[in-house]
Amino acid sequence: MIAGAGIVGVSLARELRKHCASVLLVERGEPGREASHAAAGMLAWCDPMLPHPLKRLAKASAGMNPEFAQEIEDESGMRVDLRTQGTIACFPEPPTGDAAGYVSAGDWRPLAADELARLEPRLEYSGEAAYWTPEGSVDPRALIAASVKAAKHRGVDIASGSAVTEVELEGGRAVAARTAKTRYAAGKVVNCCGAWAGQVGPLRFPTRPVKGQMLCVVAERHGLVNHVVRAPEVYVVPRSDGRIVIGSTLEDAGFDKRVDPETIQRLHQAAANLIPELGESRMLETWAGLRPGTPDALPLLGATRIENYFVAAGHYRDGILLAPVTALVMSQAVRGSIPDFDLSAFSSARF
């Protein structure tokens, strides 16, 4: 039984269904309507700001994404808009030290002005820039919708509309999960509740919501932006249908998902400073999402100190990127196998 039907929970359920007779997902609201729905969908495994222990997992997950996306499309009959054109990073200064070494390992290379103009003709930026060729993006709303359909196709059961609040113990091991109205008996319980993971007893994991405000626009010119474009104060993520996502803030605002018009305007202007035509684009939507953060910005992955109780939460800004590898290693852990990657840095025992 898995509590939480965001991209992590749904991906794990789908993976477990290959090996388990039955898998139940229990979701507080509608599947995939929280952080997964609000994400930009960048597959930013080359990001020099990625915490060091995550780099190996992130690189592996990025390599899994094409096959992962194709399987989901095949099983669901839906498209997820996986784009692999790469990322253009606009730096106030070129990366140095460990950051430079890491992004170089990810096919990072500096861009001369003429090549930058060729790759993004409408980008008006004269500072240092780099091209992270293996990166890309996916439409997270399409991905989670297709993933839910694919999970159902594999036989995963989904109960929505009620939050898991307690894990029932018997003899020191997890035997069931409870919502306000229902008890679900289970041989194994996995907490995939994201920012809400700490609200599920008996272990109060130190997850917290980190608010991010974003907007989506459409420009008159189709193909205005060809790549994900990242700068210190803003990022721009194009979709294949002409929509362009602009984000984002990092706010400690609890579970408040209200949108501030001034903040949205500031993000829109920051994007227009890079690509002036974005300033004339038509706004389609604004929203705020709650990223699941932890004190050290690393996810919680693996078994807990309670037998048969597992956690996969706290992926912060990288849930979409890390979904494939999380599904793999957590499926292995839940089934009692040794995970392909060392999860000790992500153990909940560190808190």
Description of each model-found segment:
Residues 1-3, 26, 177, 184-196, ...:
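Short hydrophobic core segments
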Residues 41-119, 270-272:
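Dinucleotide-binding Rossmann-like beta1-alpha1 core, especially the glycine-rich loop
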Residues 11-19, 41-44, 78-83, 183-308:
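Active-site substrate-recognition segment that forms the wall
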